[in-house]
UniProtKB/Swiss-Prot annotation:
The modification Phosphoserine is found at S708. GO terms for biological process: protein folding in endoplasmic reticulum. Residues 10-135 form the Thioredoxin domain. Keywords: Membrane, Phosphoprotein, Transmembrane, Transmembrane helix. This is Uncharacterized protein C3D6.13c. GO terms for cellular component: endoplasmic reticulum; Golgi apparatus; membrane. It comes from Schizosaccharomyces pombe (strain 972 / ATCC 24843). The keyword Chaperone does not apply. One of its GO terms (molecular function) is protein disulfide isomerase activity.
């Protein structure tokens, strides 16, 4: 018996050790207060400081794990290590950490560099950082002995017959489709520039991996062979397979820029960076000229509007200056005293202090987060990296992989007039989502976009579409921005105080009430996520199909009218409204423990009932928590889908419940009276009673005065007393 028990314990120990080893290999060494200082004192350490509850840390997590997994072969045998510090447990180690996530590079126990985390942080950028510090003595612009082409290599390249008739400067993987007959073998005769170490094993490179930019350019200059480069933004492990299986886009363009032009561009970029917040402080703006220059600067300014009479502004100043110091060389930071510069504060309707606004090229957005250093730095990092850029298919794939919510605007030459309106909305999305532009037919096919222009939002890989019924809707800035604000949350966000207004802004919200303390919480949450994703995907397909039918009908009417040359019919056909509206239903999950008191209004105790689903209409304060058969709504796809359809199409078929309030209001609402109507009726009745009371009092006073005399008091008027009063 003892031997069996001992054997079981040993097997469990081996399993735990194996799992720990795998986690260590993938995510890095977990460091504690006891061993952090001793470990980092030897060699080079790249360490992530994080909090499990931090949203930014959760976004960084997959990128960090994938980076460590891909870099472990490169760092094997070297003195380079990866580590992680959980700041919720290791308080001493995180005493000097002002914001999470923070990435530090240690060499022999000293911090030598910090990697800023922001919107531009990606798995590729982290890998590049690691590669740079693995080979600190290697200059990528200087070819090593192994990189220089030998005479034999030169003869081999010179003898190759060019497979393309035009000069080619970029080969973009997974971009616009080319004929599938163009396989990788057609490029086997091209010399490929060594744009990155990651591509040295790619089959697109038939010339030796020794070929560098300078040597290939030299060979190309003495022969008719066109120089071909390969985009470096390709996954190193899948590059070989992608070249054979992916579709290609060949873009004809001039050959490599001259060294002089490259040097000038580099100098301009470095000069621009030097001019951005060079001292790492907040600049005081007082003169109108300085203020106007800052507010219209293309580099962007993060500005605090305050008043010298504001007590709260003094409390914020420490965090503000600390943020400004961390934005050295990244983002311009300033402050404006509204007691002195009244014009600027009046121009931007500053109502309270302090107010934080980010300006870029005359557009601005208000920061509404907490005024502490960590939150200010997070927003400032995103503001520093803010841009609205053109994207291709690979960019959208990476954004989906990172779990980002992003808006995508499709346009062509005929719809370019709407671009300024769309660009104007971009800065309003700062801190919530990214805005991208594209003309790619491949991306349009992926997201089932059948006509341009079209604005969509992609959440967890699922596209939802801006409902533009007529061309004028694409010019309506407020309507577009309102739709964006209603859709910048993920498919299944967690209900929080900060986002509750956005979540309950729609007609109905499907709430998954979960208990994080249960063992199957993660599995249940994944099921809820899958249900929400599949519903929105199905709704997107239905909406696009109906939109296409309506559009075809409109085009048919226009063509018929033009054939008959009927001007009135042509005008009527062009004014034909394309009907169609996406489902307004939104999804969210609720922490039943945290929101226990609020859930009592629904007569729900999550600990007693377990996970369940309700459909809540916040505008009318009504909800559905049972099926037509009277059973609770379970977290199952068919059940949830049926309830949503019934609520949207025939809400009277299901018996709704009213949010629990005081007994009097609840009783009246049970007869179908709306709470707002009740308040209005109550107000009218109250005013009526007051008018009746004061009117009666006034009438009685006037009546008394009519029956009184100027000589006798009222009490003696009917006594019959007469006589002398002297």
């Amino acid at each position: 018996m003892r031997s069996n028990t001992f054997g079981s314990v040993m097997r469990i120990s081996w399993v735990v050790a194996f799992i720990t080893m795998v986690q260590t290999l993938v995510s890095g060494v977990p460091l504690t207060d006891n061993d952090l200082e001793s470990e980092v004192s030897k060699g080079t350490w790249f360490i992530k400081y994080y909090l499990p509850s931090c949203g930014a840390c959760k976004r960084l997590g997959p990128m960090w794990d994938n980076m460590v997994e891909k870099a472990k072969e490169q760092v094997e045998g070297s003195n380079f290590h990866f580590g992680e510090v959980d700041c919720s447990k290791e308080l001493s180690s995180c005493a000097n950490i002002r914001a999470v996530p923070t990435l530090y590079l240690y060499q022999n126990g000293e911090i030598v560099e910090e990697v800023p985390f922001g919107a531009s942080t990606s798995e590729a950028s982290l890998l590049d950082f690691v590669e740079t510090h693995l080979n600190p003595d290697t200059d990528p612009d200087i070819p090593s002995d192994e990189d220089v082409l030998t005479d034999e290599d030169t003869e081999e390249v010179a003898s190759i017959q060019p497979a393309l008739s035009t000069s080619v400067s970029s080969l973009s993987l997974a971009s616009t489709a080319m004929s599938k007959s163009a396989s990788a073998s057609e490029f086997s005769g091209s010399s490929v520039t060594k744009a990155s170490k990651k591509l040295t094993s790619s089959p697109t490179s038939v010339a030796s991996k020794k070929a560098t930019l300078s040597s290939v350019s030299k060979v190309a200059s003495t022969s008719s062979l066109p120089v071909t480069s390969v985009s470096a933004s390709v996954d190193p492990k899948s590059a070989a397979s992608k070249v054979q299986d992916a579709e290609f886009s060949i873009q004809t363009a001039p050959s490599f820029p001259k060294e002089k032009e490259e040097k000038e561009n580099t100098e301009e970029t470095e000069e621009s960076k030097k001019s951005i917040n060079p001292t790492g402080t907040s600049k005081a703006l007082a003169l109108d000229a300085d203020i106007d220059a800052a507010l219209t600067d293309k580099e962007g300014w993060f500005i605090q509007f305050y008043s010298s009479e504001c007590d709260d502004c003094d409390d914020v100043s420490t965090a503000w200056y600390a943020m400004a110091n961390r934005m050295r060389g990244k983002l311009n930071v300033a402050h404006i005293n509204c007691a002195v510069s009244k014009r600027a504060c009046k121009q931007y309707s500053i109502q309270y202090f302090p107010t934080f606004l980010f300006f870029k090229e005359e557009a601005f957005v208000e920061y509404v987060g907490l005024p502490n250093e960590g939150d200010l730095v997070s927003f400032a990092e995103e503001a520093a990296n803010f841009e609205i850029r053109e994207v291709e298919l690979l960019d959208t794939v990476n954004a989906e992989k990172n779990g980002d919510v992003f808006f995508l605007y499709f346009y062509d030459d005929d719809s370019a007039e709407y671009l300024n309106i769309i660009r104007k909305t971009g800065i309003q999305l700062l801190g919530h989502a990214n805005l991208y532009l594209t003309t790619s037919q491949q991306i349009a096919k992926k997201y089932r976009v059948v006509s341009f222009p079209k604005l969509i939002v992609v959440r967890d890989g699922i596209a939802s579409y801006y409902p533009a019924k007529m061309a004028q809707d694409n010019k309506d800035y407020r309507r577009i921005l309102g739709w964006m604000k209603n859709n910048w949350l993920p498919v299944l966000p967690e209900l929080r105080t900060s986002n509750s207004k956005e979540i309950f802004n729609d007609e109905s919200v499907v709430l998954f009430l979960l208990n994080p303390e249960l063992d199957d919480f993660d599995e249940t949450k994944r099921t809820a996520q899958k249900i929400a994703t599949e519903f929105l995907d199905e709704e997107g397909r239905t909406y696009q199909s109906n939109w296409q039918k309506e559009t075809d009908k409109k085009n048919s009417l226009v063509n018929e009218a033009e054939e008959k040359n009927d001007l009135e019919a042509i005008e009527a056909a062009k004014n034909f409204h394309v009907n169609g509206k996406p489902s307004p239903t939104r999804f969210a999950w609720v922490n039943g423990k945290f929101w226990a008191q609020w859930l009592r209004k629904f007569d729900i105790d999550i600990e007693a009932t377990g996970p369940r689903v309700i459909v809540y209409n916040a505008a009318q304060d009504i909800y559905w928590d049972e099926t037509a058969k009277g059973t609770p709504i379970s977290i199952e796809k068919d059940t949830v889908f049926d309830i949503i359809k019934q609520v949207e199409t025939d809400p009277d078929h299901l018996k709704f419940k009213i949010l629990k309030k005081n007994l009097g209001v609840e009783y009246l609402e049970s007869y179908g009276l709306n709470i707002r109507v009740l308040y209005m009726v109550l107000g009218i009745v109250t005013v009526g009673i007051l008018v009746w009371y004061f009117s009666g009092r006034r009438a009685r006073t006037l009546q008394r005065r009519r029956h009184s005399t100027p000589i006798l008091p009222v009490s003696m008027r009917s006594t019959g007393n007469s006589g002398k009063f002297d």
